[in-house]
Design a protein with these regions (language model features):
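Mid-chain, well-packed structural core segment of small domains
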Residues: 71-99
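Short acidic, glycine-rich loop/turn motifs
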Residues: 21-25, 60-62, 85-87
Length: 143
């Protein structure tokens, strides 16, 4: 990766989570819904799965548009993030980008964004995320 990946979550409101994601050539800004799934829960679990050499997927549902982040491990410190989109959950996916990088380049920014999200003070009716800062800190800073 030539440019660093950045991802940030903003304060959720009424079941919508504003997300900013940038990793060349992809630059996304969207609000994900919590109606069908909790994408932050999926992100946390995907990272845990990667640490155990398994794949993971995050579905960002925009009602009806959808982004998919598919994670896989490609080596001891190699990771791949495949980003695709679809007009709705059940439609065929169109690939947007395949990003290859190290833990520091691809996974650490996701961990950081989850930690920052844990610092928000909001009513749980606005978003169902149930992990604490201590839970997220179990994800290593580096491999």
């Amino acid at each position: 990766m030539k440019e660093p990946l950045t991802i940030a979550f903003e304060m959720p409101r009424h079941g919508w989570l504003p997300v900013r994601f940038k990793a060349a050539p992809v630059d996304l800004e969207f609000a994900a819904s919590d109606v069908l799934n909790d994408p932050l829960d999926e992100l946390y679990k995907s990272i845990q799965r990667l640490l155990n050499n398994k794949t993971g997927q995050v579905t960002w549902w925009l009602e009806p548009y959808t982004y998919f982040f598919y994670f896989e491990r490609t080596g001891a410190d190699g990771f791949r993030l495949t980003i695709s989109e679809a007009p709705d959950m059940d439609a065929g996916r169109k690939p947007l980008a395949v990003l290859d990088g190290s833990y520091k380049q691809l996974i650490a920014p996701m961990r950081k964004a989850l930690l920052e999200f844990c610092d928000f003070s909001y009513e749980k009716t606005n978003w169902p995320f149930s992990y604490t800062r201590a839970d997220i800190e179990t994800i290593p800073k580096r491999l």
